[in-house]
């Protein structure tokens, strides 16, 4: 049997992992400006953590979860999304305690798992970056979080992004709308897809979100959630819209957007961009004021979003956005002869300890091959070290771009290479 990676997974090789590191580092920098701190949760959880919070009737739970019984007969699932594990952690670690500053702001990044048909930008093991904010029901929190997502997408270079906005109201408004939707869809049941016929019984709002052609036709004239908002829900949504407008953020009201998870209420949103004629959601989230209490904590408001890293990178690639990845070596040492081997090791280590990104040849190759390696690594400077240089303790350092050279001592390189680096036209941080 030829050993290969499982279907729906990928190896992220060095040429690509640099892009991942850039995106993750960029997200950390943006989130830090908004006072978010990182939280890391296990990649597997008790099955009930996901099934009861995400919703027993959602596609994630009924079709897509990787779940199993471990050797202790505990029902375990690989996490399919990030919010439920973070809420579980928030409650379990009593981060709702009075001494913890509110609102509490967390971000996470890491692998998630869903058993679905692999396609471009969607894998069975995928990676998500997300944020969760606990303790504020102020609509300004909704807006701040949405704007933070927009800030990230704009600064990283995603183009043509449109904000789609909707509300699911409070539980009372949602219940009234749910019944109106059932009344509207029941006479049309036979025209719906099989999945939507099931959803009509279990979670009728999910019919609005269906991508099937027959379902899209059926919901064209469906009642709007906006007609069923009570005063509290209307006031909250109006405040969100007004604040977005005050900040100059354009949005589209999308009453068919419901999100695929059951825990949302009030504001929900998606950032969508068009790629090759298809609308792709790059980031999505919303408010979930009942989830902390559902996990056994006190009544606590919550708001958050998630974005898929694979999809984000796919969109950046399709839009021709080149991430500013710095892979260049500062120094490459070409080694000539066995007599230079030990000194080359000492020298490259001294350079690294001074903070330079340095590499040397280990394969005793001809100089031409070593110089080619220096070019492949985009080395800024090149040192050729042979037995004669070791004996004289003098070496030539070359700017590998302009070919300018300086003659220096090995001691200077070992102790103060930054002076030479700057003399050759480069700047140290």
Curated annotation (Swiss-Prot):
This is Histidine--tRNA ligase. One of its GO terms (biological process) is histidyl-tRNA aminoacylation. GO terms for molecular function: ATP binding; catalytic activity, acting on a protein; histidine-tRNA ligase activity; transferase activity. The gene is hisS. It is found in: Cytoplasm. Its main location: cytoplasm. One of its GO terms (cellular component) is cytoplasm. Its EC number is 6.1.1.21. The lineage of its organism: Bacteria, Bacillati, Bacillota, Bacilli, Lactobacillales. Belongs to the class-II aminoacyl-tRNA synthetase family.
